């Protein structure tokens, strides 16, 4: 169901930036307000320990919250 991936308007206090796997990002990028807590609805794999999904504009990032590193980037996830 394509509408499951339709995102609402996304506003962030920072500009869009493409993140690659393995890069470190600031904790403000994975603050609680940007977390995707209902990852099952989007058919995303269960995050591992100390990992969380966050929305960055139309992308979803799987981030290790202890290190700030991007584990997996899903670009263009929302439309």
Where in this protein do the model-derived segments appear?
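Low-complexity segments
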Residues: 1-79
